[in-house]
């Protein structure tokens, strides 16, 4: 049976106590095929009852339960008959609220720790080795479990590493099962989701598409929608989903600022407009953007100018359209979480990169606001967007404008665009495109002496940046084979004008960022 709203899916909710890993918990549960949301720690009991989750997870957080202003839950939550898993601070809070004892640890644990499962019947550890390593990050610990709880695991510095009350289906783990540094963390979460909560894996992208198409049609009716199309994955998927729902009632305004990767604008038009039928107005505005950027070298100023100009071009085109009621955006669930709100809004001034004039009144529509980035990519493929377009690497809004260090000119953009295309082609030829998180070229504005033929040259240097990462928060430089780097370097020098040197950035993040500007 088709799902028509989120209440039709089994769900496990995560209450937010401030941990840096909160989004990961939600992601892991969704990866199991179970719908999950990250919600405020003080979510009302009435709202929880309305959502009817199969389980609740208390996240970790930086507080001590004894801190003034420490984040708490309504004690009534323990009377709902819903299974609860407390992670790190979540375990401490549950223990404290139910009569256990929490104290400051003599030896705080930050990093890898070895635990031993001491209860052979512990459901969270069912089917897992007795000894395993986990990721700890805590300054307090539970020193006495609440009445009715058994201790199920211990470590050298944390004698109560996991607790269980099977009768009430309350469980606690002092470590972070959601991070990959915990050896069997995902299995522990699976045991909670399926064996304890009895949740069904019925969260599918096909159902989401049907649900969203139905919601969009009900909301929009016979009215018109506009969308600012950047050429990126999020706005492209938003456009395609809206087109599936309302067809030509959608007009996407594609502001081509002339700082996209090689052939990228044409690829977007081919895939979305010609192949999928999305109604797109393409505005070729490179000259306009370059005029505004003339003489500007500060990276933050460049970003602001590009963002402001994007909005102005979008506004001019939007005003040409008549009787438009809705503005669509490619807002993702990560944006919703970071903004601290989960409520829809009607706007007068709103856009991804700036604000619309006060005299433009639109109602906001955000069909991707419940999805993470990887889910958006899956959705894009389901909607028929080409794989290469859906799986393009992260690309900054200002585009190549911040990969030209210093003043941006048409000639410099051409150098970066051509060198970047060579890098991509050779990485793909070597079969490395799925192994490297992100890779691109940079024009640092450095000139150096070289020799080409019988003559002396004094030309630009190209920098290659390639990194491996899991989430982009930290990154290591990619160890590309020397023969591949050699071929890339040779081709860039031979095929790109005004380049006589290629260097490879071997700095990790931190201390460097992935982008140079």
From Swiss-Prot:
GO cellular component, one term: cytosol
Binding annotation for ATP: 230-236
A GO MF label: ATP binding
Domain of life, source organism: Bacteria
Segments forming domain GMPS ATP-PPase: 203-392
Pathway(s) this gene product operates in, as recorded in its UniProt entry: Purine metabolism; GMP biosynthesis; GMP from XMP (L-Gln route): step 1/1
Keywords assigned by UniProt, alphabetized: ATP-binding, Glutamine amidotransferase, GMP biosynthesis, Ligase, Nucleotide-binding, Purine biosynthesis
SUPFAM superfamilies on file: Adenine nucleotide alpha hydrolases-like (SSF52402), Class I glutamine amidotransferase-like (SSF52317)
Enzyme Commission number, as recorded: 6.3.5.2
Active-site residue list: 88, 176, 178
Domain Glutamine amidotransferase type-1: 11-202
InterPro entries, A to Z: Class_I_gatase-like (IPR029062), GATASE (IPR017926), GMP_synth_C (IPR001674), GMP_synth_GATase (IPR004739), GMP_synthase (IPR022955), GMPS_ATP_PPase_dom (IPR025777), NAD/GMP_synthase (IPR022310), Rossmann-like_a/b/a_fold (IPR014729)
Database matches in PROSITE patterns: GATASE_TYPE_1, GMPS_ATP_PPASE
Reaction(s) catalysed (UniProt annotation): XMP + L-glutamine + ATP + H2O = GMP + L-glutamate + AMP + diphosphate + 2 H(+)
Pfam families: GATase (PF00117), GMP_synt_C (PF00958), NAD_synthase (PF02540)
Subunit structure, interactors included: Homodimer.
Function: Catalyzes the synthesis of GMP from XMP.
Protein name: GMP synthase [glutamine-hydrolyzing]
Organism: Lactobacillus johnsonii (strain CNCM I-12250 / La1 / NCC 533)
Record gene name: guaA
């Amino acid at each position: 049976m088709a799902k028509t709203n989120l209440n039709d899916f089994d769900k496990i909710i995560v209450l937010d106590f401030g941990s840096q890993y909160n989004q990961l918990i939600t992601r892991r549960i969704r990866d199991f095929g179970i719908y999950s949301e990250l919600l405020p720690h003080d979510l009302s009991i009435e709202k929880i009852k309305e959502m009817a989750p199969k389980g609740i997870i208390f996240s970790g957080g930086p507080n001590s339960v004894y801190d003034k202003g420490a984040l708490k839950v309504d004690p009534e939550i323990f009377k709902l008959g819903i299974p609860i898993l407390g992670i790190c601070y979540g375990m401490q809070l549950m223990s404290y609220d139910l009569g256990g004892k929490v104290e400051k640890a003599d030896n705080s644990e930050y990093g890898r720790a070895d635990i031993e499962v001491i209860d052979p019947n512990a459901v969270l550890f069912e089917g897992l080795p007795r000894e395993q390593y986990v990721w700890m990050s805590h300054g307090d610990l539970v020193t006495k479990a609440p009445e009715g709880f058994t201790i199920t695991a211990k470590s050298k510095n944390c004698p109560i590493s996991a607790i269980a009350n099977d009768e009430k289906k309350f469980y606690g783990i002092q470590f972070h099962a959601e991070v990959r540094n915990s050896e069997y963390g995902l299995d522990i979460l699976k045991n909670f989701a399926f064996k304890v909560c009895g949740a069904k894996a019925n969260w599918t992208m096909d159902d989401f598409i049907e649900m969203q198409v139905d919601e969009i049609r009900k909301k929009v009716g016979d009215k018109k929608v506009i969308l600012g199309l950047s050429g990126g994955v999020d706005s492209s998927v938003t456009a395609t989903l809206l087109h599936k729902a309302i067809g030509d009632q959608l007009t996407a305004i594609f502001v081509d600022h002339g700082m996209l990767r090689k052939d990228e604008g044409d690829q977007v038009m081919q895939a979305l407009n010609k192949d999928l039928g999305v109604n797109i107005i393409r505005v070729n505005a490179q000259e306009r953007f370059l005029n505004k950027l003339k003489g500007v070298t500060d990276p933050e100023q460049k970003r602001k100018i590009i963002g402001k100009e994007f909005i102005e071009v979008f506004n001019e085109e939007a005003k040409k359209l008549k009787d438009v009621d809705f503005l669509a955006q490619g807002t993702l669930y990560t944006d919703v979480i970071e903004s601290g709100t989960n409520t829809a809004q009607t706007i007068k001034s709103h856009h991804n990169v700036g604000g619309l004039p006060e005299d433009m009144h639109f109602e906001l529509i955000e069909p991707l606001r419940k999805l993470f980035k990887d889910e958006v990519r899956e959705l894009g493929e389901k909607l028929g967007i080409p794989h290469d377009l859906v799986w393009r690497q992260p690309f900054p809004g200002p585009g190549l404008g911040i990969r030209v260090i210093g003043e941006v000119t048409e000639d410099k953009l051409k150098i970066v665009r051509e060198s970047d295309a060579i890098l991509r082609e050779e990485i793909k030829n070597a079969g490395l495109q799925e192994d490297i998180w992100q890779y691109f070229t940079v024009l640092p504005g450095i000139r150096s002496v070289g020799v080409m033929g019988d003559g002396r040259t004094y030309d630009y240097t190209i920098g290659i940046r390639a990194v491996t990462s899991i989430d982009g928060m930290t990154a290591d430089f990619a160890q590309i084979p020397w023969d591949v780097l050699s071929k890339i370097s040779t081709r860039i020098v031979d095929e790109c004008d005004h380049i006589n040197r290629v260097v490879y950035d071997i700095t990790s993040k931190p201390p460097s960022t992935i982008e140079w500007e």
